[in-house]
UniProtKB/Swiss-Prot annotation:
Gene Ontology, cellular component aspect: cytoplasm
GO molecular function: nucleoside triphosphate diphosphatase activity
SUPFAM superfamilies: ITPase-like (SSF52972)
UniProt xrefs under InterPro entries: ITPase-like_fam, Maf-like
Record's function text: Nucleoside triphosphate pyrophosphatase. May have a dual role in cell division arrest and in preventing the incorporation of modified nucleotides into cellular nucleic acids.
Subcellular location as annotated: Cytoplasm
PANTHER family, per the entry: BIFUNCTIONAL DTTP/UTP PYROPHOSPHATASE/METHYLTRANSFERASE PROTEIN-RELATED, BIFUNCTIONAL DTTP_UTP PYROPHOSPHATASE_METHYLTRANSFERASE PROTEIN-RELATED
Enzyme class, first EC level, given as a word: hydrolase
Keywords: Cytoplasm, Hydrolase, Nucleotide metabolism
Domain of life: Bacteria
Organism: Legionella pneumophila (strain Corby)
GO biological process: nucleotide metabolic process
Protein's name in the database: Nucleoside triphosphate pyrophosphatase
Catalytic activity: a ribonucleoside 5'-triphosphate + H2O = a ribonucleoside 5'-phosphate + diphosphate + H(+); a 2'-deoxyribonucleoside 5'-triphosphate + H2O = a 2'-deoxyribonucleoside 5'-phosphate + diphosphate + H(+)
C-alpha cells in the first residue's frame, strides 16, 4: 500500500476474482477469505418478495461468518442479484442453463442489484445497495452459442461477463460498471473513510 493511504486490517469475504480486482484498484491491502455460508439454502429459506432484502441478508451473513473468526479485521462482504421481474437468475454453472438464461433475458430489461456491508467484531457497521438496469439486444441462437463458447460465463449471474465480451450483448445500460460487476466503489470508499477504516 502507498504512503498516501493509512488503513486498518481489512478482509474481503468474497471468492469473486472481479471483486478482488476492483478492491485492488483502490490501492488497499486486504486478505481474501470467502465465507462458508450456504447461499442456496439461505435463498430457499427467504420468504419475502423483497429481493434487496435478500441480497443484504446474504452480504450480512457472509460478513458475520468471517468476522467471528477475525474480530480484529473489518470485513467487507457483497452479494449480487440478477433480477427480471420477480425472477432471480443465479449463476448458471453449466452451458445448458446459461443458454436458457440468455434466451429468457434476450431483448428484455433486467437489474443487477449489488449489496454490500462492512462488519467488525460481529457488528454491522454499514450496509448499502445499488441497482443497475440493463437491456439486452435481441440475441439469436447463433450469437448466444458463440458468446458462451467464447467466454464461458457459467459463474456469473445473468450468464454474461460484463467486464469482458459481455458488453457487446447490450443495447442500453443505466448504472455504474462497478455496480454491474458487484462492488460499487464510490459508496464503499466513502464508507471506509467515514468509519475511519482508511485515512488519507
Amino acid at each position: 500500500m502507498s504512503k498516501f493511504l493509512q488503513q486498518k486490517p481489512i478482509i474481503l469475504a468474497s471468492s469473486s476474482t472481479i471483486r478482488h480486482k476492483l478492491m485492488k484498484s483502490l490501492g488497499l491491502d486486504f486478505l481474501v477469505l470467502p465465507s462458508n455460508c450456504n447461499e442456496e439454502e439461505i435463498k430457499t429459506r427467504h420468504k419475502s418478495d423483497e429481493l434487496v432484502e435478500l441480497g443484504i441478508t446474504l452480504a450480512k451473513i457472509k460478513a458475520l461468518d468471517v468476522s467471528q473468526h477475525y474480530p480484529e479485521h473489518y470485513i467487507i462482504a457483497a452479494d449480487q442479484l440478477c433480477v427480471a421481474g420477480k425472477r432471480v437468475f443465479n449463476k448458471p454453472l453449466n452451458h445448458q442453463t446459461a443458454v436458457s438464461h440468455l434466451r429468457e433475458l434476450s431483448g428484455k430489461q433486467h437489474q443487477q442489484i449489488a449489496c454490500l456491508c462492512i462488519v467488525k467484531e460481529s457488528k454491522i457497521l454499514w450496509q448499502y445497495h445499488e441497482t443497475a438496469t440493463l437491456t439486452l439486444h435481441h440475441l439469436s441462437e447463433k450469437t448466444i452459442e458463440a458468446y458462451l463458447q467464447a467466454e464461458k460465463p457459467y459463474q456469473s449471474c445473468g450468464a454474461y461477463q460484463y467486464e469482458g465480451l459481455g458488453k457487446w450483448l447490450f443495447k442500453e445500460v443505466q448504472g455504474s460498471e462497478d455496480t454491474i460487476l458487484g462492488l460499487p466503489l464510490m459508496p464503499l470508499v466513502n464508507a471506509l473513510v467515514n468509519l475511519k477504516v482508511v485515512g488519507i
